[in-house]
Amino acid sequence: RYGHRMNSNHYSLPLIGIIADDLTSAADFSAPFVRKGLSAEVCGVAPVSLVKTTSEIISIDCDSRSMTAKHAADASTLATRALAKLPFLCKTVDSTLRGHIREELLASYNTSGRSRLIFAPAFPEAGRTTVGGTQYVNGTPVSQSTYAKDPNHPAWTSHVADLISEDIQGAMILDAQSQAELNSQVASIDRPEDVLWAGSPGLAIALAETKSPLNFSPPEPLTAERTLVVVGSANPISHEQAAQLDGLSCATCVTAPRERDKDPKRV
């Protein structure tokens, strides 16, 4: 039903399509499936060739966070149209509810051909939970958290329903305070191919655990002599984490050129 591996160089159409608003979410949503043994390809909106790919997952980075709401919706429409025929269709949503979520969800839903929208923004492993339709970050409503002060993409509401257009019929919001709770809810939903799945990495984990269309063997863990950590976020928590790494004697911190210009003594 979902296609299968033909040989080492050819697959039928991919199994899972992901429409993402930035590169991080394009990779993050793919990761739980990759850990299950599926392969993923992350690409830009155009051109997307489903015929040439040998991956089970196609994740399209729309790079729409920095766009206007209209352009973000247009990018989501284009990406969804390219992936709409795949068995599983997913739309990433930031777990702190930043970005043009309402516009992108409507655009993707209208283009997807799906009859239902399942919206699950919780990512319990990162402290992002959904309780009574309200999104929390470490117990604080997201619109009252530091994410509401994001200079470019502030979280303007904590109420998940505010992000679903009235034009979308059959939408369901999933509350979850733990990953196990989210997994259980996702597992109970039938006909997954009729659903546009919208959410954060927590939803991806649940889908990979309960709805993975093929049972592949997890890949062997990779080993490395050294570890590269790249911090490219403006979030204060990321800055604190980078500062802690910089203070370790075993770590070498290479700063961005602009920061090196401010402080030439730093590497």
Where are these predicted regions, by residue range?
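Short, Lys/Arg-enriched N-terminal segments with co-localized hydrophobic residues
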Residues: 1-5
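Cap/lid and interdomain-hinge subdomains that line or gate substrate/regulatory clefts
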Residues: 9-16, 39-43, 56, 69-73, ...
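Globin-like tetrapyrrole-binding proteins
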Residues: 21
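Short glycine/serine/threonine-rich phosphate/pyrophosphate-binding segments
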Residues: 26-29, 100-101, 206, 238-239
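Residues that scaffold, gate, or flank divalent-cation-dependent active/transport sites
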Residues: 30-38, 46-47
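Short gly/pro/ser/thr-enriched loop/turn and capping motifs at secondary-structure boundaries
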Residues: 48-50, 124-128, 203-206
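A structural-propensity feature for long, helix-poor, extended segments
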Residues: 53-63
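Conserved, well-structured core segments that form the ligand-binding/active-site neighborhood
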Residues: 134-266
